[in-house]
Every structure is written in C-alpha cells, then in structure tokens.
Amino acid sequence: MKPLLLAISLSLIAALQAHHLLASDEEIQDVSGTWYLKAMTVDRELPEMNLESVTPMTLTILEGGNLEAKATMLISGQCQEVKVILEKTDEPGKYTANRGKHVAYIIRSHMKDHYIFYCEGRDPENNLEALEDFEKAAGARGLSTESILIPRQSETCSPGSD
C-alpha cells in the first residue's frame, strides 16, 4: 500500500517542483497538523488504485526534521491506513521516502494555508482558486488536468472496514 500512495502522491510532487518555490524550513514547521487532500493527479495509469474517499491526513514533524504522514483511505471498498515517513534532505522543502527511491517536495501554493503536496488545505471545503493554482502547476509539468481526482471527504474510515 505504501508504494501505491507514494506512486500517486510523490510522482505528482516531484513533477511540480519547478512551478512554485519550495517551502522553507520555517514554513515546514507550519505543516504539522491536520490537512485535507483536495485534489490529485498522476502521470501514469494506476488500474489497481480505486480511491473512493480519504480521511484528513495528519502530518507530524519528527526528530531531525523528518515528517510522518498518516491517513486512512477507502480504496476499492476497503478502508486502509497508510503511513509514510518522509526523510528531510539538505534542500529545504525536499524529502525522500522508501530509502531514497522517491523524492517529495513541499511546494508553496499561491493560496494561503495551501501547499502542493499530499494534501491541499487544512479545511475540507474546496477552494476554487487553490484548485486552479493546482491545475496550472500540474499542467505546467505536462500532467493532464483532465485526470485530476477530487476525492470525497470522510471523517472516519477504520482499517479493514468498508
């Protein structure tokens, strides 16, 4: 499950690096807490991924500046908990996961309280301006804006349940 989440999220993040400035170390301190995934897109087909809904994601800053991301997602009718550790690099806003196999970036959005990352904002309400900013960033890197997925927000989803 971790590679699947990383394939979905991290490929997007890495592809969007050039659109915005990377978040500084000071800004990274603000990402700890609850975030809501507002939209996502990928650069390849993932037939095994049938994301129906996602609960709010919790980001926690760990010792040494690493980040832990946790969320529960309804995938193909089953709730599955996903946890990923993002390891800080020397470059502000840049992280690696899965022993360096994946590179992740936390990128500043033009919208307040939004980042281009796993999730887009701290509240569950969609912000059309933030979505437009996300679409521009995705389009600038050659990702199809037509394949952007906006998952249904759900408050709870227990692993193993449907």
From Swiss-Prot:
Checking InterPro entries in the record gives: Calycin (IPR012674), Lipocalin (IPR002345), Lipocln_cytosolic_FA-bd_dom (IPR000566), von_Ebner_gland (IPR002450)
Q: Does the keyword Secreted apply?
A: yes
* GO cellular component terms attached to this protein's record: extracellular space
Coiled-coil region: none
Is Signal there in the keyword field?
yes
Keywords, alphabetical: Secreted, Signal
Q: Give the subcellular location.
A: Secreted
What's one Pfam family here?
Lipocalin
* Annotated signal sequence range: 1-18
Tell me a Gene Ontology molecular-function term this record carries.
Answer: small molecule binding
Q: Identify its protein family.
A: Belongs to the calycin superfamily. Lipocalin family.
Which PANTHER family does the UniProt record give? Answer: LIPOCALIN, LIPOCALIN 1-LIKE PROTEIN 1-RELATED
Function comment: May bind a variety of ligands including lipids.
Q: Report the protein name in the record.
A: Putative lipocalin 1-like protein 1
Question: What is the native source organism of this protein?
Answer: Homo sapiens (Human)
